[in-house]
Regions:
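Extreme N-terminal starter segment of soluble prokaryotic enzymes
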Residues: 1-4, 19
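Short, polar loop motifs at secondary-structure junctions
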Residues: 7-8, 85-91, 105-108
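Catalytic core of the metallo-beta-lactamase
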Residues: 10-16, 111-142
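A short helix->loop->beta-strand "cap" motif at the edges of active sites that frequently abuts
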Residues: 18, 76-81
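Pre-active-site segment of Zn-dependent metallo-hydrolases
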Residues: 18-56, 68-72
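Active-site neighborhood of phospho(di)ester-bond hydrolases with catalytic His/Asp-centered motifs
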Residues: 22-23, 51-63, 83-86, 142
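Metal-dependent catalytic neighborhoods of phosphoester/phosphodiester hydrolases
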Residues: 66-76, 94
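Helix-loop-beta element that forms the nucleotide-linked donor phosphate-binding surface
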Residues: 92-102
C-alpha cells in the first residue's frame, strides 16, 4: 500500500486494487471563511485528478470535508463509497444517489473491495468526529 500525504490532514492510500482518500482539503475554502486561515503551501494539482474508490470524512470541519474539494471527486461522477461521520454524512449526501454514502459513526465497520474500515473514537471539538482503522497485507493503518 502506497501512502501519500495530500495536505492538511489528508492522505491517499493506494495499491493496484483500491484508492482511498481520507479528509481531502485541496482548496483554500477556510481562507474564504477566515483570512487568517490562508493555505501556506500550494496544492499538488495531480491530487485533484484522482478517481477514488473510497473517501473517508472523519468530521465536517472544512479542512476535512471541504465542499470545493469534494466537487472534484463526486460531482458528475459515480460509484464512490463515502464513509462519513454523521455531520459530514448529512452534507455529502447532497451529491446525489450516484455514490454509496455510509454513515460512519464510532464502532461502524464497512468493507469495500475486501478492506474493512472501522470508525473509532476521536477526541475532538467536534463530538461526532471519528478516527478510521483499516488493514491491508498484514499492515494496519490508523
Amino acid at each position: 500500500m502506497k501512502v501519500t500525504w495530500i495536505g492538511q490532514a489528508g492522505f491517499l492510500f493506494e495499491n493496484e486494487n483500491i484508492k482511498i482518500i481520507i479528509d481531502p482539503y485541496l482548496s483554500d475554502s477556510c481562507y474564504k471563511v477566515n483570512p487568517r486561515l490562508k493555505r501556506n503551501y500550494s496544492v499538488e494539482e495531480s491530487f485533484l485528478k484522482i478517481n477514488p474508490d473510497v473517501i473517508v470524512l472523519t468530521h465536517s470541519h472544512l479542512d476535512h470535508a471541504d465542499p470545493e474539494t469534494l466537487d472534484y471527486y463526486l460531482k458528475d461522477k459515480s460509484g464512490v463509497t463515502v464513509l462519513a461521520s454523521e455531520n459530514a454524512w448529512n452534507k455529502v449526501r447532497t451529491y446525489g444517489s450516484e455514490h454509496n454514502y455510509v454513515l460512519f459513526n464510532n464502532g461502524t465497520e464497512f468493507t469495500v473491495k475486501g478492506i474493512t474500515f472501522k470508525a473509532v473514537y476521536a477526541c475532538h471539538s467536534d463530538n461526532q468526529a471519528v478516527g478510521v482503522v483499516f488493514s491491508v497485507n498484514n499492515k494496519t493503518y490508523y
